[in-house]
Amino acid sequence: MLNYLCQDNESGELFFVQCADETERDEILLANGFDLDEIDIIDVMDDEDAEILGYDTY
């Protein structure tokens, strides 16, 4: 699994999307009501690094 560190440009919220690839990531974001044009992908991390940061995960 990949952990995409994302930022919502409207709220400034940082969060992870845990998924297998970019297509699945976008599907998860849309299913959770996010506008893809308002989301920046900051980094892609492994599970261990993502757990250390502790942001919410979708």
Feature roles, as predicted:
Residues 12-20:
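A short, exposed loop/beta-hairpin motif centered on an aromatic-Gly-Thr core
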